[in-house]
């Protein structure tokens, strides 16, 4: 144990500091505590006291498994039999135990048992893995106070509410803890929350001064007692309301004192904490809700096909039972027996009694439903699950979607939506971190009305290209750019006027100094000094913030240390010209949030002056300037607009001196608001800070570049050529979003922009003088009018409506999404080539996604990288998360994760198309083979006067779907490629086969079913007629049921497998093995099964070796049936490919006929793949060609005088 003196000698003050006061006062009403939602009471260090035990809080054992040992079988069986097909086979299996069954119970129940068992084994394995993870977590060890001043190792699962624990460096917190003290004197600790929100930057927590001063070592806890009264368990990770009672005093608690389970202690030797929430009451577990259940369109269509097949089965059973009942009633009795005596088993009179014909018909109905159950593909669901899992593995292991820089491959987090990737109609994309890198670089700034920095952004280059000029250069700049030295991450600034200390020679040096000081002081970054090199790096809450601190350092204002109440930095002194160290006392941090759109700090400089330093969005900051602080406003606004035009992210910087009395009053109100435990505490804090952040003096503005990711314009171009619509939903300013649209080729020069915003003079006037209701009414009317004008403009343009782009801001979007207006908005948006929604909130992103999904009825894909994109990702049919620098929340909420936007091209055009094509073909073929098999059963049943006698042996029936036809279908679903990846890129319109659902339309489904019916007719009638007069016995006996059934079954196995071989576009050795292996296995099985004793093999005893194999007619019949059964497919395919080829078939001809290197032939086909769209650089080049042609036409007309 370390005593307090030793601890203070070793670690006097932390290098990691909190920005809220550790000493809290309690002067606010706390009536919520003890009321609804705030009823939790924690007896610290007394978990076993009677008062604590009466509370009966949850233990710390966490179970993430779906099943327990006791519930596995009943619960998993219930899950399986919720599927209609499985329930149907269960019912038929139960009926097979009765006299109604046409076959043995074992052969009826075995296939169902195999399918159910396979799925249950899969469920069991997945749940066992979860169980192992639970065991590993629950058995972790942590030091727990035993009540006598000693901490002993204890497993996490045994923790109780009120326990005192000691967590050491790099350990995870075992529960939600109240931070009591740490190894640092100021009771702060550094916490990594990647497991909670995915963010990699470290968070700072600080205990109360009241506990940190009392609890310095293990022995101090022997007599420690305290009572926490706080909120009940909830999902809010960022808010905690409670109080701590120590002796006679109470202290307010906030999230700043709470250490959440599954976060990790970093850069701190140890902390002491009291357990507040355990197990499933912890915030991380409260947040671990299941993502929304998503099902693909193909799956939903498949369910309808299953219901159709059920209807067909019941219809056939009904018709057959009616016919059977009529024939039974008319069956005459002669000489003590009926005319159809040969149909009646000895012990089954009731089924064939002419006196009880209606009852016989009813019994036959149940027999027929069992007999025709083979129309329903019992193994379809499990086969599709296997295929989708294997497809997901291929996606995960695709080296072309692996991002080496961050070591991140693609990750299919769910396999349910693979085929949906090939059906996407609209992509809704975030901008920052998705289209751009979210790696900010300080590139320009405006100080005292003068622009600095001459770096050229990607957007400016795109603007120059589209205007036909040279890259934009600021006319005010006449400087020499110093290109020496290595490039600094986060800093891409070029301007010698302010670099290398030259700023001191500028006329506005005093303003420049204040500007750079603000960059060095107004932030929440943490400096970390490398002990070997002495270099300082920064841990910041956002890439923007890190870029500002790095920029300040490069300008000569190096922030190098932070204490609990101070910020230290080095700067060049204006008077002496030497580097000096300055320490500003940090008094308050007014934190940034999306509502305030600004952050400020209140500091006392080394001259004793109180300063408020603030930075924020231009629309928020300009309205807060004092009358005497607007000296550079017009010029700064102009520069901000220019920066936005260049696609840069801007912030405005301002400051003011604060009067001592004003600060005292503010600080009192501010601390009281922070100490409040009322529900409106955050609103109260915002109100108080709003009053302080007024009458500011403008210094200038910053501009940072978030560059487009590599390959974004090319990816967007290819997706546009595939016919996919792309919407951008961003929180950025309209000007920034528009110019990113140009840089990414979403927009181009000739595209007409329909801009909808509320920047009209009327609205601005009302915002200054009108009431809230009046503003809302005028705003709504303005949005409606602008939407109507946009629709009229589109209507007037006629067929060229794709040349329009819709751009709408967040305020207008609020009204456009209202129930009465949203259809008008959607109609306009879907008629435009590009849509950009600016200043969008996370909720608006989700609502727009929902509107597009429900309004168009087509597949939507949302892609984003931040926590603000989670709602959008979960609302879309497919959510794609970018594993970028904003953390992992988007990835954790997504269906598929990729590292770069450009990988979306391969994910959709290649994997999406392949998965769609494979699954569609697989399901169609499944129903084809089952109809082929089932119709032969029905025809034989009709041929035998609906006697209920099956055409095939029991085991033949049972094993058809399991062993003789399923593996080739699975191989098709995993390996087939109708078109190679190279041709998917070359002919992007191929993707429209999925969007238009060409390969799984009802026309194609019915066509495959009809093909199965034709195959069954050929098999049954050819087999029946060819064997009718054939002898299969030395005694002269003709073919019986076992001979006809064996021959028909052989033909079915050959036909369905050869049909599969004909349907495959891309053969692999696996497909050869499973197709020819399935056929060979039938003969092997027939020989082995037929060689078994007659009691087991029944009528199949020696049928192959003694009857079928020696008979030439068996082999000739099989050959001719195969040919005649497949001829209709050959004829159809030939006519269809000759006169009505699908697009993938045209591309296949290019490959098969050797035209892939014939430029003219390829260009002819490729032209069909290029849609007349204005999105993408291909469209831009085409427009350039058209402009050039018009230009030359005009010159020609001028020359000839036309």
UniProtKB/Swiss-Prot annotation:
It comes from the Eukaryota. Residues 1-73, 123-305, 383-920, 975-1004, 1064-1069, 1133-1202 are cytoplasmic. Its EC number is 7.6.2.1. The active site is at residue 430. Residues 96-99, 328-364, 941-954, 1028-1040, 1091-1107 are extracellular. The keyword Translocase applies. Keywords: ATP-binding, Cell membrane, Magnesium, Membrane, Metal-binding, Nucleotide-binding, Translocase, Transmembrane, Transmembrane helix. The keyword ATP-binding applies. Involved in transport of phospholipids. This is Phospholipid-transporting ATPase 10.
């Amino acid at each position: 144990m370390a005593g307090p003196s030793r601890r203070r000698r070793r670690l006097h003050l932390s290098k990691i500091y909190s920005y809220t006061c550790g000493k809290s006062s309690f002067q606010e009403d706390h009536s919520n505590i003890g009321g609804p939602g705030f009823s939790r009471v924690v007896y610290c260090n007394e978990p076993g006291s009677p008062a604590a035990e009466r509370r009966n809080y949850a233990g710390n054992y966490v179970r993430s498994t779906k099943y327990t040992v006791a519930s596995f079988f009943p619960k998993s069986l219930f899950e399986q039999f919720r599927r209609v097909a499985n329930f149907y086979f269960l019912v038929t299996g139960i009926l097979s135990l009765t006299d109604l069954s046409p076959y043995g119970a074992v052969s009826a129940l075995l296939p169902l048992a195999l399918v159910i068992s396979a799925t249950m084994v899969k469920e069991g394995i997945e749940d066992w893995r979860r169980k192992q993870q639970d065991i590993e977590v629950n058995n972790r060890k942590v030091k727990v106070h035993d009540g006598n001043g000693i901490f002993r190792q204890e497993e996490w699962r045994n923790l109780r509410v009120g326990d005192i624990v000691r967590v050491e460096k790099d350990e995870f917190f075992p529960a939600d803890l109240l931070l009591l003290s740490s190894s640092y004197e100021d009771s702060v600790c550094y916490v990594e929350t990647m497991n909670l929100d995915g963010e990699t930057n470290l968070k700072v927590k600080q205990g109360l001064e009241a506990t940190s001063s009392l609890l310095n070592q293990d022995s101090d806890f022997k007599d420690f007692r305290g009572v926490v009264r706080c909120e009940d368990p909830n999902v809010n990770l960022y808010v905690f309301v409670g109080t701590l009672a120590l002796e006679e005093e109470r202290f307010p608690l906030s999230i700043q004192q709470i250490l959440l389970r599954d976060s990790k202690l970093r850069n701190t030797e140890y902390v002491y904490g009291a357990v507040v929430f355990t197990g499933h009451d912890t915030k991380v577990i409260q947040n671990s809700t299941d993502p929304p259940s998503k099902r693909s369109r193909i799956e939903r269509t498949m369910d309808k096909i299953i219901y159709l097949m059920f209807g067909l089965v019941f219809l056939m059973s009904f018709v057959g039972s009616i016919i059977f009942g009529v024939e039974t009633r008319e069956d005459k009795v002669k000489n003590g027996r009926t005319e159809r005596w040969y149909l009646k088993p000895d012990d089954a009179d009731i089924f064939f009694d002419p006196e009880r014909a209606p009852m016989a018909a009813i019994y036959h109905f149940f027999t027929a439903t069992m007999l025709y159950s083979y129309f329903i593909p019992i193994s379809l669901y499990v086969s599709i699950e296997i295929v989708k899992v294997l497809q997901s593995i291929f996606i995960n292991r695709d080296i072309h979607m692996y991002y080496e820089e961050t070591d991140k491959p693609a990750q299919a987090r769910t396999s349910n939506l693979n085929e949906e990737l090939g059906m996407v109609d609209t992509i809704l994309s975030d901008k920052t971190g998705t289209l751009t890198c979210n790696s900010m670089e300080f590139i320009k700034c405006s100080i005292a009305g003068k622009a600095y920095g001459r770096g050229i952004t990607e957007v400016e280059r795109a603007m120059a290209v589209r205007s036909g000029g040279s890259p934009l250069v600021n006319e005010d700049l006449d400087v020499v750019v110093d290109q020496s030295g290595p490039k600094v991450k986060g800093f891409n600034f070029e301007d010698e006027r302010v670099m290398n200390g030259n700023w001191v020679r500028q006329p506005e040096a005093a303003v420049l100094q204040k500007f750079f000081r603000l960059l060095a002081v107004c932030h929440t970054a943490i400096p970390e000094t490398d002990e070997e090199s002495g270099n300082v790096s920064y841990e910041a809450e956002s890439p923007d913030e890190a870029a500002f601190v790095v920029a300040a350092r490069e300008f000569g204002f190096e922030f190098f240390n932070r204490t609990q109440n101070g910020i230290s930095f080095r700067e060049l002194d204006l008077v002496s010209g030497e580097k000096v160290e300055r320490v500003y006392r940090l008094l308050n941090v007014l934190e940034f949030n999306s509502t305030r759109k600004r952050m400020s700090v209140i500091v006392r400089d080394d001259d004793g002056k109180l300063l408020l330093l603030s930075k924020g969005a231009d629309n928020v900051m300009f309205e807060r300037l004092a009358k005497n602080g607007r000296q550079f406003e017009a010029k700064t606004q102009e520069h901000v607009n220019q920066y936005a035009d260049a696609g840069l992210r801007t912030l405005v910087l301002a400051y003011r001196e604060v009067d001592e009395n004003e600060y005292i009053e503010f600080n009192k109100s501010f601390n009281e608001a922070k100490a409040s435990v009322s529900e409106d505490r955050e609103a109260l804090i915002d109100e108080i800070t709003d009053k302080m952040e007024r009458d500011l003096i403008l210094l200038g503005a910053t501009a940072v570049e978030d560059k487009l990711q590599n390959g974004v314009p090319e990816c967007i171009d290819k997706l546009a050529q595939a016919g996919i619509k792309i919407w951008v939903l961003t929180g950025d300013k309209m000007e920034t979003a528009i110019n990113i649209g140009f840089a990414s080729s979403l927009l181009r020069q000739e595209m007409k922009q329909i801009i909808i915003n509320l920047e009209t003079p009327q609205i601005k006037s009302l915002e200054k003088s009108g009431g809230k209701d009046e503003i809302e009414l005028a705003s709504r009317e303005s949005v409606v009018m602008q939407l109507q004008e946009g629709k009229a403009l589109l209507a007037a343009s006629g067929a060229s409506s794709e040349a329009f782009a819709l751009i709408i801001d967040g305020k207008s979007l609020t009204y456009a999404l209202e129930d009465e207006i949203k259809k008008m908005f959607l109609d306009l948006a879907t008629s435009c080539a590009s849509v950009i929604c600016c200043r969008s909130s996370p909720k608006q992103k989700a609502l727009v996604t929902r509107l597009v999904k429900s309004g168009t009825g087509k597949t939507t894909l949302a892609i984003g990288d931040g926590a603000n994109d989670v709602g959008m990702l979960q609302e879309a049919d497919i959510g794609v998360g970018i594993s970028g620098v904003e953390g992992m929340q988007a990835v954790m909420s997504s269906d598929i994760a990729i590292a770069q936007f450009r990988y979306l091209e391969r994910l959709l055009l290649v994997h999406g198309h392949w998965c769609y094509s494979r699954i569609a073909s697989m399901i169609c073929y499944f129903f084809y083979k089952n109809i082929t098999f089932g119709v032969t059963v029905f025809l034989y049943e009709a041929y035998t006067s609906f006697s209920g006698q099956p055409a095939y042996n029991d085991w033949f029936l049972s094993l058809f779907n399991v062993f003789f036809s399923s593996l080739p279908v699975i191989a098709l679903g995993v390996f087939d490629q109708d078109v190679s990846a190279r041709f998917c890129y070359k002919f992007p319109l191929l993707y429209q086969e999925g969007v238009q659902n060409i390969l799984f339309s009802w026309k194609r489904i019915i066509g495959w079913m009809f093909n199965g019916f034709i195959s069954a007719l050929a098999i049954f009638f050819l087999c029946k007629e060819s064997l009718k007069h054939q002898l299969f016995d030395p005694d002269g006996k003709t073919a019986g049921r076992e001979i006809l059934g064996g021959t028909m079954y052989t033909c079915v196995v050959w036909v369905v497998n050869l049909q599969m071989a004909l349907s495959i576009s891309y053969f692999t050795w696996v497909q050869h093995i499973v197709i020819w292996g399935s056929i060979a296995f039938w003969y092997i099985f027939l020989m082995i099964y037929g060689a078994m004793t007659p009691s087991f093999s029944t009528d199949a005893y020696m049928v192959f070796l003694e009857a079928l194999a020696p008979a030439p007619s068996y082999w000739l019949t099989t050959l001719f049936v195969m040919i005649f059964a497949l001829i209709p497919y050959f004829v159809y395919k030939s006519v269809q490919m000759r006169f009505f080829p699908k697009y993938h078939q045209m591309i296949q001809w290019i490959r098969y006929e050797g035209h892939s290197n014939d430029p003219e032939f390829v260009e002819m086909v490729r032209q069909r793949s290029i849609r007349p769209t204005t999105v993408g650089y291909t469209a831009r080049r085409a427009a350039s060609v058209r402009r050039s042609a018009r230009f030359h036409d005009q010159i020609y007309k001028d020359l000839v005088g036309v």
